[in-house]
Amino acid sequence: MLLVSFAALILASAYFSSSETGMMSLNRYRLKHLKREKHAGAMRASRLLEKPDKLIGVILIGNNFVNFLAASIATSIAIAIVGDPAPIATAIILTLVVLIFAEVTPKTIAALYPEKVAYPSSILLILLLKILYPVVWMVNIVSNLSLIHI
């Protein structure tokens, strides 16, 4: 069961990573054109892109949450299998797994096919933004306050 949970979390991380790249890689002129034609995915993506701080916020909150949870589960699995030296080995293996399957590959696919990634992913992103809005709002406030001194 832990392995299934771990795999699901890596897939969730891949979703967030690809969503970020897909949304940010959309051609704005084509997006505007499709929005005028009432393309549902373009309308959703456009709405999300109107507030990029909230979009990036919800993506980063989701991605960090699933990555930390995946790390915890991976450590539990490794300790059960290997024992004490597991945390170091887990960190190395998890870094490679996340880089390959949850970062580089999904982001590359999204950069190549932004519309195919961004439009469908906008459905869940809108839902997550509604659910996590208070957290996103708070993170953005703290982040903006930290930028005042820069």
Description of each model-found segment:
Residues 1-148:
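Membrane-embedded alpha-helical segments of inner-membrane proteins
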